[in-house]
Amino acid sequence: MSSINYPFVTEKAMMLLDENKLQFIVDTRSNKKQIVEDVEKLYGFKVKAVRTMTTMKGTKKAVLAFEEPEAAHEIATRIGLM
């Protein structure tokens, strides 16, 4: 089972694409290692860094930075964000 629930799409999240970063809502029980493994397996791009936070609504959000240039744009295009 994947720890990735769905992409987090806001205006601020779209501006992070220029920094080669994407945001996802993830399972609250997942850790950073599981999130990195799932994203790399699903989308085929290496993750450079991951930051997680719990929102006020009780969901867990992960901000992922990618090693390859333009990886975030490619993934966003694949999942239909652009």
Swiss-Prot record:
Q: Does the keyword Acyltransferase apply?
A: no
- What InterPro entries does the record tag this protein with? Nucleotide-bd_a/b_plait_sf, Ribosomal_uL23, Ribosomal_uL23-like, Ribosomal_uL23/eL15/eS24_sf
A Pfam family reported for this protein in Swiss-Prot or TrEMBL: Ribosomal_L23
What are the record keywords, sorted? Ribonucleoprotein, Ribosomal protein, RNA-binding, rRNA-binding
SUPFAM superfamilies, per the entry: Ribosomal proteins S24e, L23 and L15e
Q: Which PANTHER family match?
A: 60S RIBOSOMAL PROTEIN L23A
Job of this protein: Binds to 23S rRNA. One of the proteins that surrounds the polypeptide exit tunnel on the outside of the ribosome.
Q: How does it assemble?
A: Part of the 50S ribosomal subunit. Contacts protein L29.
> Which NCBIfam families did the record assign?
PRK14548.1, uL23_arch
Name the UniProt record assigns to this protein: Large ribosomal subunit protein uL23
Please name the taxonomic classification of the source.
Archaea, Methanobacteriati, Methanobacteriota, Stenosarchaea group, Methanomicrobia
